[in-house]
Amino acid sequence: MPKHSLEQIKEKITERSKKTRELYLENIFNPKNQPKIESLGCANIAHVTASMPEHLKMPLGSHKRKHFAIITAYNDMLSAHQPFKNYPDLIKKELQEHNAYASVASGVPAMCDGITQGYDGMELSLFSRDVIALSTAVGLSHNVFDGAFFLGVCDKIVPGLLIGALSFGNLASVFVPSGPMVSGIENYKKAKARQDFAMGKINREELLKVEMQSYHDVGTCTFYGTANSNQMMMEFMGLHVANSSFINPNNPLRKVLVEESAKRLASGEVLPLAKLIDEKSILNALIGLMATGGSTNHTLHLIAIARSCGVILNWDDFDAVSDLIPLLAKVYPNGSADVNAFEACGGLAFVIKELLKEGLLFEDAHTIMDTETQKGMQNYTKTPFLENGQLVYKDAVNHSLNTDILRPVSEPFAANGGLKILKGNLGRSVIKISAIKDEHRKVKARAIVFKTQSEFLERFKNKELERDFVAVLPFQGPKSNGMPELHKLTTNLGALQDMGYKVALVTDGRMSGASGKVPSAIHLSPEGALNGAIVKIKDGDLIELDASNNALNVLEKDFDNRGTNPLFLETLENLEKPSFGLGRELFTSLRLNVNTAEEGAMSFGIKA
């Protein structure tokens, strides 16, 4: 039975994580690491309270009121993070109603992959996750807090916040989202405009107009990429107030949900983060990822998060869970609908309700919504509403309101989850199958090897790629150049696919959570910088990518005995040299110390 199989997966993870999990918990709850404001010197305490309202200084300084940290990713350029501007004031005001207070302990950086996509700044993107984790730790290192709020939404921000928060797992913690922007132009129309521009059918001004109709307001992008997959995972891990992920920023309900976050932390009922996040909650996040067709980036981030609390998750677990969990949602790029339409027809509450009903979720996982009378994931089968200005929760719908977007377990879009692990003589890689049509899931074609994204785009522009081929792009892994997303290739590969050509991508780099219809074997491990087999591929090699059978192979008899393609010898020799420009040289030590994609691509030495 599926439930038994999930239990077996959990037991395997628990067994392999026994020593690392025990060590993590021992360190986190060591008496030396607990909040110590009452034992600080008077001068130290005065520094804590100096900027606070006068009437709060003595109560907080003498620990007669709870004092919570706010770690915020606010900036006012990025649409998803602009709404966080007023959250600290909302939280502080609500906490004072409950004899508590909060301070903004730290800001963390928040960069947008949508801005740097295809440009050199993207090489900082993955490492920004680890910088965010470090920045979170700096903010909490004053060690005077009783708990913490984490304000963040987008791609590397939420994983970075959670990795940092788990270093302070003795604190009760709540994650607070901002929600998606209201719907603009349909995502498929935006994608078509990009392809039309790539083919020279529309000009730059026409494309810009379409893009601005898509990205037009505050909130996250409305497609189901990494940012919105983050929000899903926070729900499935029980770190959000229930079903707060996909409420638009300017909806009056959003303010009330922020206030509810403050109430939950002030209640004293929220467990320390280290006790709340365990094998069950991590597996629940993975189950949610598969059931909704979420972002490939979480084959990195969820592993890094798990290892940060002593849980050893690996790609085999992703494969095993994918075999058990049906695909219940079709949200762009997996379908044409956006997350607002997904929310309107039942949303995460319906997905969780369905999975629980069929025994496909760990119901007894701890959450921030746990109370003495109601514990576990059942709290997340309810949807928030405003009635007379008050927050009320009602049971999720029993039936999807649009089965083109959301379906029950009994009638899924597919029997298996949205992500798979490919294996073969190139190593192991990740593919997102939920957005790929059946007729494109197997590609057998000759390789064209590229040194850079720019070379690919130039050759496409010159009409040199109008044929069946597998694009091979090595040295895009974490040790090579920080593992940038290669989403800019999607438009061009998609255009070639629409012209009737059989095309695919093989790379040790990443793709955006928005990437979809072209079969792409990504995160290939070992990567090129570790002399992975990808560096042996030559132009003209016959490659077979078979997503239905989880296989990726070079079909050349001499392949296993080959050396490195001479095209890349100079690249290998220069790997330890810093890349200059846009601050990339400052990240050289992170790049040289990063572990593998299968280990989460972490750069600060967590060895779990």
Predicted regions and their residues:
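A short, small-residue-rich loop immediately preceding and capping a beta-strand
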Residues: 136, 140-161, 174-176
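Acidic/charged coordination and interface sites in well-structured regions
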Residues: 86
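Contiguous domain-boundary segments centered on the initiation and propagation of an alpha-helix
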Residues: 129-136, 143-147, 457-468
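N-terminal small/polar loop signature for handling phosphorylated ligands or for N-terminal nucleophile
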Residues: 105-143
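Catalytic or ion-coupling anion/metal-binding cores of large enzyme and transporter domains
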Residues: 1-76, 80, 89-108, 119-121, ...
